[in-house]
């Protein structure tokens, strides 16, 4: 059977980890990193919802997305974003851990990769990341617990990405205190089902404790879709491709979000 994209990405991440161990041993987590969850809550209080703007130059589903440089991206998104999600995966997403420090000057940074080891979390902390993405489907329950605990030791918050409400509830149980994401993209096939994501966000919001921050991820490429995600129960949305490809669309979405009642 042909390996899924997720299986390939996990294998690649494990190979890269061995190359990162020496770097991790020689670095210290940066002090004074801002809190991702606090920034999201502040935006929810101020305007009713938060945007995590993702810097993503390419992807396995879309190929090359944009050549927009980090300076231009920050200038375009800084005033209306609660945080940045920075792709650090190099092979499919054209990412790098070296991007983190620049974005961390302005907002809390979510380091986004297929994280399978404590080494990756430590390096993210050393580079200035406030939070790290843990993909539930890429980890066993024990691995998720161990990596969440490692993140806590380094002062790194965790966003656990899940495919549906039942996994979201389980993730919150396994990694208490984590931010929970529901992704509309199937990581095995790379297909996006935005409507299914809305249903799962709504179910997750009903089942999760009120203090758990819920994030809607992927497939949000218009103001209407953004607002529907908030109405379904997400406190934050993560938007990548739409912000990278289309400056006009980016401005429309951000302007609309600033008017959330």
Curated annotation (Swiss-Prot):
Pfam hit, one: IGPS
Top-level taxonomic group: Archaea
Keyword field: Amino-acid biosynthesis, Aromatic amino acid biosynthesis, Decarboxylase, Lyase, Tryptophan biosynthesis
Record's catalysed reaction(s): 1-(2-carboxyphenylamino)-1-deoxy-D-ribulose 5-phosphate + H(+) = (1S,2R)-1-C-(indol-3-yl)glycerol 3-phosphate + CO2 + H2O
InterPro entries to which the protein is assigned, alphabetical: Aldolase_TIM (IPR013785), Indole-3-glycerol_P_synth (IPR045186), Indole-3-glycerol_P_synth_dom (IPR013798), Indole-3-GlycerolPSynthase_CS (IPR001468), RibuloseP-bd_barrel (IPR011060)
Stored Gene3D superfamilies: Aldolase class I
Keyword Amino-acid biosynthesis: yes
Principal EC category: lyase
EC number(s) on file: 4.1.1.48
Gene Ontology MF terms: indole-3-glycerol-phosphate synthase activity; phosphoribosylanthranilate isomerase activity
Example GO biological process: L-tryptophan biosynthetic process
Pathway assigned in UniProt: Amino-acid biosynthesis; L-tryptophan biosynthesis; L-tryptophan from chorismate: step 4/5
Signal peptide: none
Matches recorded under HAMAP family: IGPS_A
Entry similarity comment: Belongs to the TrpC family.
PANTHER family tied to this protein: INDOLE-3-GLYCEROL-PHOSPHATE SYNTHASE (PTHR22854:SF2), TRYPTOPHAN BIOSYNTHESIS PROTEIN (PTHR22854)
Protein name: Indole-3-glycerol phosphate synthase
Species: Aeropyrum pernix (strain ATCC 700893 / DSM 11879 / JCM 9820 / NBRC 100138 / K1)
């Amino acid at each position: 059977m042909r390996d899924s994209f997720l299986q390939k990405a996990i294998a690649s991440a494990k190979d890269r980890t061995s190359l990162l161990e020496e770097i991790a041993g020689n670095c210290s987590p940066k002090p004074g990193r801002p809190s991702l969850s606090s920034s999201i809550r502040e935006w929810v209080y101020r305007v009713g919802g938060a945007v995590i703007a993702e810097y993503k130059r390419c992807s396995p589903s879309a190929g090359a997305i944009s050549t927009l440089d980090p300076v231009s991206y920050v200038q375009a998104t800084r005033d209306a974003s609660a945080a940045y999600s920075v792709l650090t995966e190099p092979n499919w997403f054209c990412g790098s851990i070296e991007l983190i420090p620049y974005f961390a000057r302005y907002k809390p940074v979510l380091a986004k990769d297929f994280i399978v080891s404590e080494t990756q979390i430590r390096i993210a902390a050393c580079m200035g990341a406030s939070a790290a993405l843990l993909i539930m489907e890429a980890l066993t329950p024990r691995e998720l617990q161990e990596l969440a605990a490692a993140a806590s030791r380094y002062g790194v918050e965790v966003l656990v990405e899940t495919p549906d409400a039942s996994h979201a509830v389980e993730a919150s149980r396994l990694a208490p205190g984590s931010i929970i994401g529901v992704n509309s993209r199937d990581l095995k096939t790379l297909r996006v089902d935005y409507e299914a994501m809305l249903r799962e966000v709504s179910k997750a919001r009903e089942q999760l404790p009120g203090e758990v921050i819920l994030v809607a991820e992927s497939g949000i490429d218009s103001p209407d879709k953004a607002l529907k995600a908030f109405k379904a129960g997400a406190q934050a949305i993560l938007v990548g491709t739409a912000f990278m490809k289309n400056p006009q669309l980016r401005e429309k979405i951000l302007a609309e979000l600033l008017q959330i009642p």
